[in-house]
Amino acid sequence: MMRILSLLVFFALGGPAQQLDVVLSAIQGLELVGPQSPDFEALVTQIIGTDRPVALVAALPYTVVVRNRTSEAIAAIDTVWTAPDRILLNAADAMFDQAFLYVKPGQAVLASPPGILQNQRQLRIFAYGTADDHRLKNFQDPGNVTVTVDAVVFESGQFVGADRYGAFERWQAQIQAPRDLATAVLQRRGGQSISDIVSWLEGLAAVRRPPADPHAQETIPTARVLLAVYRSKGEEALYSRAKSILDVPVFPLRR
């Protein structure tokens, strides 16, 4: 779920943050609190404590507190940052297969460009050196930034929101694409050699520029995971991993 970023230098390039304008969400029961609010600092401390990695401190001017005041836990949040002339980041963060991370009724979390933060333990992600920094490249000197929550998915699977930025299709792909690839692997098992199957997976995994289609986007990381399993544990482990993907109950996403 977390968008892992190495941003110490990155944010330094951006200079001082501009004002973050928080647009209240049209989703009933969702409360947003931005850095301009006198309550913001206390809420941040309540959620993650006072020990703040440098990268998080730099991200806080673009961060918003999201409190769930509905009666149902939230399984996915689409937070969108925009500038007057462009979308800076459309972060459709989902916890479909991690029920322990659902945002419970009454709970508040931080929606920041690096990811959704729920507690202090998650801050260790900032110490890791891996990066998905394309998610924040447009935050370099962005001017005035607007943030809102465009859509959520509740624990029941119910999608709620305007869906102006394609979150439903992206979440649908996150659920279905791994299952489709796992099914294809098991179907090929009987009619193709393992070398042919691996070659096919390598072709899927080798894509460097993400395609526009969300289903194709979500196929790439699954192919890489399956390849890693095969390379470390062998053919039977590959098929076992594919089967385990299909054994997981399907999250009931619906409009």
Predicted regions and their residues:
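Asparagine-centered strand-capping/turn motif at beta-strand->loop junctions
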Residues: 58-60, 64-75, 83
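Low-complexity, acidic Ser/Thr/Pro/Gly-rich terminal tails and inter-domain linkers that flank the onset
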Residues: 17-61, 69
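A eukaryote-biased signal for long
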Residues: 194-255
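Short acidic/polar inter-strand loop motif in beta-rich domains
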Residues: 86, 151-162
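Beta-strand-rich interaction surfaces with strong enrichment in secreted/lumenal proteins
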Residues: 51-52, 74, 98-102
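Short beta-strand elements
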Residues: 160-191
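Intrinsically disordered, low-complexity Pro/Gly/Ser/Thr-rich segments with frequent PxxP/GP/PP motifs
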Residues: 85-139, 155
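Sec-dependent N-terminal signal peptides
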Residues: 2-14
